[in-house]
């Protein structure tokens, strides 16, 4: 029996399957082609030579057919199965259907009673490699996220994008206007050697793109290395218009992270509802890489801030209007005509990743994204 209280363990089986287990977990390694999981969360990558690799839980038996999949087994008597690529066969002991197939991009929740239902796939919930691994592990995790249909923006700041001056959106079904136009900005080193970023120094440096959507729920995750600007606000991701629902995400002059949306049309501050954190951009953090994230849940009327995978602030906000993303700017921000003359926002520093989801990510998903993406 293998018992893991905290952290992650990666096992490569003689048959070729690779499994990453996240604690707390209890596993029994039966053979090099069969594992029993009584509790825990795991990610499995199974090459062709290991087709038929089995993972058993008290609720379901999963037989791999050459794929990547994740499982979460709880003490409460449920098992989740998420298929990121390929397909698996699964059998529920108390269900009359016998063996069934679960295809790529699908996920199920199985109860110990034998009942099961389809659930949204959540690749960000699963750790694909132990934290602090290497760039290959980050690239694997980045590719895995593309199986999530709610991923609407994925900027990796890859070499081809920076060379072409167009920041490619790697999200599935990305629309042409969602690819970012790089204005100014120069390539620089990112979080680790070999990782690229964009450096923002001049007032015109920014990335422009459009994401013409209304969001009942939304998550933004950014890796950023901010410097002091000397201006009242340091812009991260801002909408260009002053229509109801338009979003804003920035630091204020006191180093507090601010996220919110415009409730009424117009540029006045009274038209905006926002949630502020305590001081996060301290002198010690200036010039260092950090993961920033916010989660907006319109049905609950909440904004939640995260720093380096940890929740730092949450607050309530009006449920209407929905959060709107139209024309957006990363970094320095200049609003459309009709705004007050002091409305511009500066940004000095580097950015090397941006993710936007059209759902509210869970705490563990934000933490996993930080774990796999932190500096090597």
Model segments located where?
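Short, aromatic/His-centered strand-loop micro-motif at the edge of beta-sheets
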Residues: 265-291
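Carbohydrate-binding surfaces in secreted/extracellular proteins
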Residues: 294-316
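Extracellular/lumenal ectodomain signal focusing on beta-strand-rich modules
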Residues: 39, 85, 154, 184, ...
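Extracellular glycan-recognition modules
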Residues: 148-154, 159-179, 188, 199-267, ...
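Flexible, surface-exposed loop/linker segments and immediately adjacent secondary-structure boundaries
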Residues: 1, 5-108
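Flexible glycan-contacting loops in extracellular carbohydrate-active proteins
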Residues: 191, 315-350
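Extended recognition patches within non-cytosolic domains
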Residues: 104, 113-115, 119-149, 302, ...
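Glycine-centered tight beta-turn/hairpin loop motif at sheet-sheet or coil-to-beta transitions
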Residues: 14-16, 59, 95, 202-204, ...
């Amino acid at each position: 029996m293998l018992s893991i209280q905290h952290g992650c363990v990666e096992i490569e089986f003689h048959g070729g399957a690779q499994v990453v287990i996240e604690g707390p977990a209890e596993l029994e390694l039966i053979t090099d082609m069969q594992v029993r999981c009584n509790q825990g969360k795991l990610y499995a990558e199974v090459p062709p030579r290991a087709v038929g690799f089995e993972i058993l839980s008290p609720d379901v038996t999963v037989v791999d057919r050459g794929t990547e999949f994740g499982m979460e087994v709880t003490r409460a008597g449920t098992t989740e199965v998420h298929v990121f690529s390929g397909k698996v066969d699964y059998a529920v002991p108390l269900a009359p259907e016998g063996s069934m197939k679960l295809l790529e991009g699908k996920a199920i929740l199985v109860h110990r009673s034998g009942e099961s239902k389809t659930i949204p796939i959540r690749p960000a919930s699963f750790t694909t490699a132990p934290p602090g691994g290497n760039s290959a592990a980050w690239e694997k995790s980045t590719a895995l996220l593309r199986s999530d249909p709610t991923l609407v923006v994925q900027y990796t700041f890859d070499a081809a994008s920076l060379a072409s001056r167009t920041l490619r959106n790697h999200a599935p079904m990305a629309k042409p206007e969602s690819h970012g136009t790089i204005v100014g900005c120069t390539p620089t080193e990112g979080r680790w050697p070999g990782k690229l970023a964009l450096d923002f120094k001049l007032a015109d440096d920014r990335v422009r793109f459009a994401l013409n959507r209304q969001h009942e729920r939304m998550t933004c995750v950014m890796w950023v290395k901010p410097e002091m600007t000397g201006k009242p606000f340091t812009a991260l991701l801002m909408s260009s218009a002053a229509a109801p629902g338009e979003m804003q995400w920035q630091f204020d002059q006191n180093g507090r992270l601010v996220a919110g949306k415009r409730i009424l049309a117009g540029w006045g501050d009274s038209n905006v509802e926002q949630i502020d954190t305590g001081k996060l951009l301290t002198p010690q953090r200036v010039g260092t890489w950090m993961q920033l994230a916010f989660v907006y849940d319109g049905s609950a009327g909440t904004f939640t801030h995260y720093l380096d995978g940890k929740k730092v602030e949450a607050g309530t906000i009006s449920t209407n209007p929905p959060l709107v993303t139209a024309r957006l700017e990363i970094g320095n921000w200049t609003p459309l005509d009709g705004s007050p003359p002091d409305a511009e926002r500066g940004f000095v520093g580097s950015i090397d990743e941006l993710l936007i989801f059209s759902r509210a990510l869970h705490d563990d998903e934000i933490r996993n994204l930080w774990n796999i993406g932190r500096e090597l």
